[in-house]
UniProtKB/Swiss-Prot annotation:
It comes from the Bacteria. The lineage of its organism: Bacteria, Pseudomonadati, Pseudomonadota, Gammaproteobacteria, Thiotrichales. Keywords: Cytoplasm, DNA-binding. Residues 1-27 are annotated as: Disordered. This is Nucleoid-associated protein FTL_1411. InterPro entries: YbaB-like_sf, YbaB/EbfC. NCBIfam families: DNA_YbaB_EbfC. It comes from Francisella tularensis subsp. holarctica (strain LVS). Belongs to the YbaB/EbfC family. Its main location: cytoplasm. GO terms for cellular component: bacterial nucleoid; cytosol. Binds to DNA and alters its conformation. May be involved in regulation of gene expression, nucleoid organization and DNA protection.
Length: 112
């Protein structure tokens, strides 16, 4: 079996390009988290920046603590969606395979 260093470098470069693209896609994504059956919504970017918070007028007469809990739940919902939609970690095995690299399963990558 011959070891082709140039082929390995090409595969690694291709995988690096795919990882960069996946990271850019994550940074450009927007998700909406909600709570209280949609009465509170939070729009968040893939970089975890909150872009907007919307509170239904019907909640304005509610107790302050209830409103705070609903906002926190909506933010947590948005964070969870960003993590679920992250392509960088969820597709790393596919990217490696597409680049011609066969990764063993069970590798813990230092990113999400």
């Amino acid at each position: 079996m011959n070891f082709d260093m140039s082929k390995l470098m090409q595969q690694a470069q291709k995988m690096q390009e795919q990882m960069k693209k996946a990271q850019q896609e994550r940074e450009n994504m927007e998700v909406i988290g909600e709570s209280g059956a949609g009465l509170v919504t939070v729009t968040m970017t893939g970089k975890y920046d909150v872009k907007s918070v919307s509170i239904d007028n019907s909640l304005m007469s509610e107790d302050k603590e209830i409103l705070e809990d609903l906002i926190a739940a909506a933010v947590n919902s948005a964070v969870k969606k960003v993590e679920e939609n992250s392509t960088a970690s969820s597709n790393i095995y596919k990217m490696a395979k597409d680049a011609g690299i066969d990764l063993p399963s069970g590798i813990n990558f230092p990113f999400k």
